[in-house]
């Protein structure tokens, strides 16, 4: 036991002295990444770099002491980064540093097998060695462990502030050629202040994530905010890239148990950790949390084994066909690929898995739409259209998997910012993505009235989701009408309609939710919903009375669905200040007449040529029915 520690002590000398001995021109140096960057060693390296030429520095993500401005070191060293962050973004886009677009799952092979990637020196930070001589890579296992295993010379900063994380995070001290004990605080990432846009997106996403899901979240404010709205879930698992304070919040809520995970049962799995000291203390020597290198965490074959694997990642731009740009703004690199593609591909093939793209509808200044007809010139496609499942903005969720280009375009325009919807629709028409007569979604606010979404269980224990209709329901509504018996169609339209073409149905789904309101009862998940019933009113602005109609699918009748929908639409109409309801009902349609009579208001009616005109006012509670014209 003491032999290990003695061996380490023998190699402890001044960091400057060590670096002077091992540095020479033209070397390739790997530096530990993220909040695990060995800042003390980096500061010493920066003091010596002006004495050398053409040194190549490789790092994943800089959160520590590496400079933002590489101009003074232009002749001495050049940074190659595998992921672009705030500290390297300007240098990369000014041509003073290089960005390497790469799947993180392929990095171990690159480091170990490609002779052009052989590291001469690796500078890393570790926890103090245990009694057996093992040090933990702490909060930066990722590719640091892989670099240590392949570098010719390894120089480790031993920092007692570094958590001793468990999993496959350990390196024996004998692997280090030099060590330096230096304690200093680790960089901390403050959880950003609340964002109304991020919160709205998170609320939309929360229902998509089922109990027992295993979650991966990418870097960014919105993926982090999703965690806040998952507190009520049960038995969630975590298999992710970067563990943050948002994850800690979710863990402390009791929603995370990992008991449904296929792999690493009951364990939280990550490869990096970036957050507060509270988070670092949580992962320290915690058997609930396991850190693994990139070859494990990003392994698609392993990820896809998880039941209900959900990958939640942000985007900078998405075109109307579903191509996602997540690393650049045109030719300007903003971030990187990281594990984006690895997790998206794996989750899309996981049993019950889902891929969710989150993005604000506009740029931060509101001047540009992030949903576009075509990606900005120079933008890199990180996720192809074939792997995208759900897309969420603050205006709703679009489901793209298995959809045509036309259906994708309509779904994405429907969740774009209203200021850009007309423009997007016109551009979609010009490239023949949609019908030439396609109606654009509403362009004013308030938009989709999500407050009227609810759930209801009908006998014999059949849950249905009740919500206002959307433009993306066009095909589902067509299918619903075509399955109705002839008699029901006649009752609904008071005519023998045999066809429900696009030009007619699109007018039924593109509504303003004020003068026209349609509520549907659906079964199935977003994007695969089937309509069980529909109720609609159309407001007569002269009388302030709303004409109502209702239809229920043949397989869903006699369960109270029609009655519920009429009651619900009546509640909405009353809430909007409408005076009352009116309906035109065939005398033979006794069911609809009965529904009207159980709404709790006085029902008035008159019969002409076999059709009842039935009406009620919300200011007249149920009393004796009268047959007279409404005023």
What are these regions (language model features)?
Residues 447-631:
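Long, contiguous binding/interaction regions
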Residues 434-449, 462:
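Intrinsic disorder at enzyme termini
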Residues 1-440:
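Conserved alpha/beta enzyme-core scaffold
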Residues 337, 414, 442, 484-487, ...:
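Generic detection of intrinsically disordered/low-complexity segments and helix-coil linkers/edges
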Residues 269-272, 445, 501-502:
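Amphipathic alpha-helical surface "interface" segments used
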């Amino acid at each position: 036991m003491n032999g290990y520690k003695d061996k380490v002590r023998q190699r402890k000398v001044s960091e400057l002295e060590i670096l002077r001995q091992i540095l020479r021109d033209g070397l390739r140096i790997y530096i530990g990444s993220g909040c695990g960057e060995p800042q003390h060693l980096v500061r010493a390296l920066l003091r010596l770099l002006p004495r050398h030429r053409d040194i190549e520095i490789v790092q994943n993500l800089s959160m520590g002491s590496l400079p933002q401005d590489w101009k003074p070191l232009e002749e001495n060293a050049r940074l190659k980064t595998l992921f672009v962050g705030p500290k390297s973004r300007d240098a990369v886009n000014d041509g003073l540093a290089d960005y390497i677009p790469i799947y993180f799952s392929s990095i171990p092979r690159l480091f170990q097998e490609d002779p052009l990637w052989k590291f001469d020196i690796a500078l890393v930070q570790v926890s103090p060695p245990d009694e057996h001589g093992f040090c933990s890579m702490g909060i930066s296992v990722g590719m640091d462990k892989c670099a240590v295993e392949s570098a010719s010379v390894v120089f480790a900063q031993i920092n007692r502030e570094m958590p001793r994380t468990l999993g496959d995070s350990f390196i024996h001290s004998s692997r280090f050629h030099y060590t330096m004990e230096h304690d200093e605080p680790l960089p901390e990432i403050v959880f950003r202040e609340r964002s109304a846009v991020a919160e709205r997106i998170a609320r939309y996403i929360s229902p998509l994530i089922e109990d027992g899901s295993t979650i991966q979240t990418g870097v960014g404010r919105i993926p982090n905010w999703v965690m806040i709205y998952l507190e009520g879930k049960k038995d969630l698992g975590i298999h992710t890239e970067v563990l943050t304070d948002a994850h800690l919040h979710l863990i402390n809520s009791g929603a995370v148990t990992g008991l449904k995970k296929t792999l690493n049962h009951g364990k939280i799995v990550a490869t990096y950790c970036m957050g507060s000291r509270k988070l670092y203390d949580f992962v320290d020597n915690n058997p609930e949390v396991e850190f693994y290198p990139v070859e494990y965490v990003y392994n698609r074959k392993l990820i896809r084994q998880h039941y209900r694997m959900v990958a939640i990642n942000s985007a900078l731009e998405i075109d109307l066909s579903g191509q996602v740009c997540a690393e650049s703004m045109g030719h300007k690199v903003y971030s990187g690929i990281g594990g984006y593609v690895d997790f998206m591909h794996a989750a899309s093939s996981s049993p019950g898995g889902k891929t969710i793209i989150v993005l604000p509808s506009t740029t931060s200044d509101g001047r540009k739409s992030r949903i576009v007809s075509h990606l900005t010139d120079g933008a890199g496609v990180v996720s192809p259209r074939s792997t995208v499942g759900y897309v969420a903005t603050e205006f709703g969720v679009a489901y793209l998997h298995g959809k045509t280009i036309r259906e994708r375009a309509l779904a994405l325009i429907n969740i774009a910012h209203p200021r850009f919807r007309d423009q997007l629709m016109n551009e979609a028409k010009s490239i023949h993505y949609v019908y030439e007569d396609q109606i654009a979604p509403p362009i004013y606010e308030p938009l989709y009235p999500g407050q009227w979404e609810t759930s209801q269980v009908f006998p014999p224990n059949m849950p249905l989701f009740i919500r206002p209709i959307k433009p993306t329901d066009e095909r589902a509504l067509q299918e619903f009408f075509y399955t109705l018996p002839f008699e029901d169609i006649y009752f609904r339209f008071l005519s023998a309609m045999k066809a429900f073409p696009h030009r007619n149905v699109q007018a039924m789904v593109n509504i303003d939710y004020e003068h026209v309101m349609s509520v549907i009862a659906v079964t199935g998940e977003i994007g695969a919903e089937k309509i069980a019933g529909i109720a609609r009113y159309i407001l007569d602005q002269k009388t302030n009375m709303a004409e109502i109609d209702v239809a229920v699918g043949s397989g869903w009748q006699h369960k109270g669905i029609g009655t519920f929908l009429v009651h619900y639409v009546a509640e909405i109409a009353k809430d909007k200040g409408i005076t009352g309801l009116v309906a035109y009902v065939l005398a033979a349609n006794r069911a609809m007449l009965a529904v009207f009579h159980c709404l709790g208001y006085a029902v008035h009616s008159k019969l002409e040529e076999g059709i009842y005109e039935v009406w009620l006012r919300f200011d007249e509670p149920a009393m004796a029915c009268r047959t007279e014209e409404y005023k």
